[in-house]
Amino acid sequence: MDAPFAKTPSNLLIAGVDEAGRGPLAGPVITAAVILNPEIIIEGLADSKKLSLKKREELYEKIITNCKAFAIARADVEEIDRLNIFRATLLAMQRAINQLSIQPDKVLIDGHCCPDLPYETQAIVQGDQNVPAISAASILAKVTRDREMLKYDAQYPDYGFAIHKGYGTKAHLAAIHRFGITPVHRKSFEPVRQLKLFIPEE
């Protein structure tokens, strides 16, 4: 697992990009772009979904402290409902890359598709497992989104956002059917769009 992370080309500024939150029924999609410092190897980078909460938090601090540049962006629920999740994710990726304090020579994106960018771009399937900069981006995006879902949990305590982070678990679906939907639910997603009950925004 360590081999793919051993070396990074030192003559190019490579930005890795990933997202967190495409699948949930609630909350934003968060994206991150990271340009790592090739002179500082961050041990333990991996797909954020395969790391413990404690490890993600530790790596988050190491990444933002030691990288050359990073940016975190988002597409809100309203944008997801208006554009669809695919287009909203690409928009959030564009925002993250455009917010970098350093212009990259190349952008590597986890997945199958790339947003429209003025840089050389490449989509890499399972890039979060094999490309250090993408792994770093996945960690920043995941930690940022999880922290936001904790805030939603405090605002809407009946839904268990702190536990499932907005994904369609049995407990989350049961809460939706019992209490209706909140302003942070994605109204274009099933089964949310089947429901007409809205909790007024406070």
UniProtKB/Swiss-Prot annotation:
Q: Name one Pfam family in it.
A: RNase_HII
Which locations, inside or outside the cell, does it occupy?
Answer: Cytoplasm
NCBIfam families assigned to the protein according to its UniProt record, in alphabetical order: PRK00015.1-1, PRK00015.1-3, PRK00015.1-4
Q: What positions does the domain RNase H type-2 occupy?
A: 12-201
- Name the Gene3D superfamilies for this protein: Ribonuclease H-like superfamily/Ribonuclease H
What is the first-listed, main subcellular location in coarse terms?
cytoplasm
In which family does this protein belong, per the annotation? Belongs to the RNase HII family.
Q: How is the cofactor bound?
A: Manganese or magnesium. Binds 1 divalent metal ion per monomer in the absence of substrate. May bind a second metal ion after substrate binding.
GO terms (molecular function) for this protein are: manganese ion binding; RNA binding; RNA-DNA hybrid ribonuclease activity
* UniProt key word Metal-binding: yes
List cofactor names only. Mn(2+); Mg(2+)
- GO cellular component terms attached to this protein's record: cytoplasm; ribonuclease H2 complex
Q: What does this protein do?
A: Endonuclease that specifically degrades the RNA of RNA-DNA hybrids.
Entry EC no(s): 3.1.26.4
Q: Which UniProt keywords apply?
A: Cytoplasm, Endonuclease, Hydrolase, Manganese, Metal-binding, Nuclease
Positions of a divalent metal cation binding: 18-19, 110
Q: What protein name is recorded for this chain?
A: Ribonuclease HII
